Every structure is written in C-alpha cells, then in structure tokens.
Amino acid sequence: VSAPLPAYRSLVEQAIRSGHVHLVDLELLSGDDMVRETVELAHRHQVSVILSNHDFAATPKEEEILRRLHHMEDLGADIAKIAVMPQSAGDVLTLLSATHKASQSLSCPLITMSMKGTGLISRLSGEVFGSCLTFGSAGGASAPGQIDVGELRGILETIHRNL
C-alpha cells in the first residue's frame, strides 16, 4: 500500500476490526510502535500477521536480512516476509542462504523472494531453503519476477515429484 502512514494504519485497523479478514500484511518499516500496536490489535481479533519488508533497490547483506527477519518475529509476526531486488546472481544466493539460516532459527514461518528475472529461481525453489510460500500472477504480475500461476503450478509439481 503506498498511502501516507496514518491512512495506511487506519485501513489495516479497519480490516482487522471488520471480522472479515484472517490475515493482514504489515510493512516492517512502518515503525516499531505502529507495528507492535497493530500486531496486538490483530491478535486480539484472532487475525494473523505477516510482517513484510520490501527492498526494491537492492539485496542487503545476509546478516541484515537475518536481522530484519528476527526483528519481525520479535515484533510478534506470525509469518516473516522479505522481498529483495537482486543486482546479480550472487544476491540471489545471499537471499537463499539467509532463508535457509532463518528457517533454522526462527520459530515462525517465513516467506522470502528475490525479485525480477534474476530472482525467479528463489520463487521456484524457495521452499527447498525454508520459504513457506511463493506468489504467482493471475493476469498480470503485481511484483517484478512473478510468473503466471499456471506455469508456476506446473514447475512446482515437477519439483515436488522429484524431491
């Protein structure tokens, strides 16, 4: 959501209080106080929370990715999610390594992905490294590197048959 923070917070809180949602996705960089308060509100209403961090410019160092994921868990995330923008194939390996390490140390599930074409392999093989979910598009991609859900399903079925 690209809305000013007060409008974003109000929208998320209305969704939580509506009784019609089971899961909300909050941006980590909304600020610790806002995130903590919103997570508490969500949990009081039996709504689960994905805490997300989207880096559309670069891929942070592995230690920073791990720090962010652990911070999400510390703030009460039910699921921790990070999406990064690779500048090289090495950046994709950095994300996958961080995913594997985080899956061993976090108590909550995590979702990770490296964006654009370079990062596609992370969307297809993320679960091998510890990511619990991937995203496909139905119509048009909503993020760089998403592929059609039909294609994705076929690729994942092939991977699953051979694991």
Segment roles from a protein language model:
Residues E13, L28-L163:
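Catalytic alpha/beta core domains of metabolic enzymes, predominantly
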Residues V1-D33:
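Glycine/small-residue-rich loop that forms an oxyanion/phosphate-binding "nest" at active or ligand-binding sites
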